[in-house]
Amino acid sequence: MKKIKILITGGCGFVGTNLALYLNNYFKIECADNLSRKGSRYNLNLLKINKIKNYNFDIKDFKKILKLPKYDLIIDCCAEASVEVSKKDIDRVVSTNLLGTINLLKKARYDKSKIIFLSTSRVYGISKLNSLVKSKNINKKLNIKKLINEKDDTTGAKSIYGLTKLSSEMFIEEFSYAFNLKYIINRCGVISGPLQFGKQDQGFISLWIWKHLNKDNLNYIGYGGHGNQIRDVLHITDLCKLILIQIRKINMINNKIFTVGGSSQSYTSLSELTNICQKITNNKIKIGKKKITSIYDIPYYITDNKLVKKTYNWEPKKNIYDVVTDTYMWILKNKKKLIKYF
């Protein structure tokens, strides 16, 4: 039987590399990545070891995209995913996140490829998410409130990053309507696990672990500086397993949007994450307070996985302790190689 041929864009990023390595056991995988991100060359070496080809170019270059082979499926993981960067460098974020996706859609149209698009929880309006927590100074532990699903409000300000991803979703739906493109859109919350090189505004789980392991300082930022903001966290392996199921069923189940996250099975506040990191690393570090809240920050987000569970009989198997432990073990094993990336 002929192997399905898949292109993963952003293939040397955290999600893209994990997906490529996982799906390579089942399909013919190739990647495209311009190697602009920190850590991408580390991940490129892993692809080479596993004989996965990477095309080194920018997906904004449509002429180069057209020269790529024909694929049965494109998985679009390429994004400038930092909310704060999106405020400072609008042109780069729009050209990468939106125009890059449009180029892939044109390629998919010509080749009659299907597409799986990794979107974000940031498509939802900030004011609606802020309304879930009344106080701007969260000085006590939050309880689980509403779970966010596919039908929740996407109107209003959401960050330039979130806007580009929502706009990409709309272009995908238009291409589906006009050109019979088959697609799946996954609106993912926080994703973490091995191969993630963390920063303050992106990849905070791996950053927290790295700082504890190296006895370096951190800050709780916003909402009074108490560290009580809550996010659900999806282990990258759980996401890979879901996408494998989606690929196998895409001829039967397509043209749908799913919210995908750790949900109530895997969530944490920053203060709780600190406690977990202290236990795992056996190190206690200084945590400062920065009380001023970014206009793009939100106090609470937990995904409702009801639809994706009903559709694919899938739910996360790994909890927040698994996420932290697995990431810690990867960092510990490769610490000398990773120093220049954190």
Cite the ranges covered by each PLM segment.
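C-terminal substrate-binding subdomain of Rossmann-fold SDR/epimerase-dehydratase oxidoreductases
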Residues: N18, F57, L213-F342
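Flexible, glycine-rich phosphate/dinucleotide-binding loops
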Residues: K38, Y124, S192, G227, ...
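Residue-level signal for the nucleotide or nucleotide-sugar donor/cofactor binding architecture
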Residues: K60, K88, T96-L99, D152, ...
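Generic anion/oxyanion-binding catalytic loop in active/binding sites
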Residues: S36, I75, S82, I90, ...
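N-terminal Rossmann-like NAD(P)+-binding domain of SDR-like oxidoreductases, especially those catalyzing
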Residues: M1-G189, D326
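Activation loop
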Residues: N43, S82, F204-W208, D297, ...
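NAD(P)-dependent short-chain dehydrogenase/reductase
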Residues: L129-K146, I160, M170-I247, L273-I280
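Residue-level recognition of oxygen-bearing side chains
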Residues: K64, K70, R92, L99, ...
